[in-house]
C-alpha cells in the first residue's frame, strides 16, 4: 500500500476541505480519467483496491496512472484509553481530495473498456465520481 517513505513531521492537524481542486483537475497523461465530484479523505486501502480493480479489468491492455498519493497521517488512540498523554499513533494514511480532482488516468484501451473499468473502480470509492475524456 501507498505511504510516504519519510515526512518532515510525524503528525498533522486534520484541517478543512473547502472549495474545489485548483491543481490536478485536468487530464495530464492518459486519454480517459476518473474525476471526483465530492470532497473526501481517500485511504491508501481504498486507492489500492481501486487500482487493483482497474488493473484486473484492463489486464495487459493499457497504461494506468494514479494521480493521488496518501501523504496525510491519521492518528488514533487505543480503545478504552484515558484522555491526555499526547496524540495517538499513526493508524493509516489518507490523500486529501477536493471536488474536481483526477484520481486515475488510463490510456491504450478503447473508450468502452476504459468506461467499464472506471465504473467498476468507482464502486470501491466512498464518493461520487465521473468518467471524463481528453479534449
Curated annotation (Swiss-Prot):
Region (Disordered): 1-22
Subunit note: Part of the 50S ribosomal subunit.
Cell compartment(s), UniProt: Plastid, Chloroplast
MF terms (GO), sorted A to Z: rRNA binding; structural constituent of ribosome
UniProt GO BP: mitochondrial translation
Protein known as: Large ribosomal subunit protein uL16c
An example Gene Ontology CC term for this record: chloroplast
Keywords: Chloroplast, Plastid, Ribonucleoprotein, Ribosomal protein
Residue stretches of biased makeup (Basic residues): 1-17
Classification via HAMAP family: Ribosomal_uL16 (MF_01342)
Gene3D superfamilies in the cross-refs: Ribosomal protein L10e/L16
Family per similarity comment: Belongs to the universal ribosomal protein uL16 family.
Amino acid at each position: 500500500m501507498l505511504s510516504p517513505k519519510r515526512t518532515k513531521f510525524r503528525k498533522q492537524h486534520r484541517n478543512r476541505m473547502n472549495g474545489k481542486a485548483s491543481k490536478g483537475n485536468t487530464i495530464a497523461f492518459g486519454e480517459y480519467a476518473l474525476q471526483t465530484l465530492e470532497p473526501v479523505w481517500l485511504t491508501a486501502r481504498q486507492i489500492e483496491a481501486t487500482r487493483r480493480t482497474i488493473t484486473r479489468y484492463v489486464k495487459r491492455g493499457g497504461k494506468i496512472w494514479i494521480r493521488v498519493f496518501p501523504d496525510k497521517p491519521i492518528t488514533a488512540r487505543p480503545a478504552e484509553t484515558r484522555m491526555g498523554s499526547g496524540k495517538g499513533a499513526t493508524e493509516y494514511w489518507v490523500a486529501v481530495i477536493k471536488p474536481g480532482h483526477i484520481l486515475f488516468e488510463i490510456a491504450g484501451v478503447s473508450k468502452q473498456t476504459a468506461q467499464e473499468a472506471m465504473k467498476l473502480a468507482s464502486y470501491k470509492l466512498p464518493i461520487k465520481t465521473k468518467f471524463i475524456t481528453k479534449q
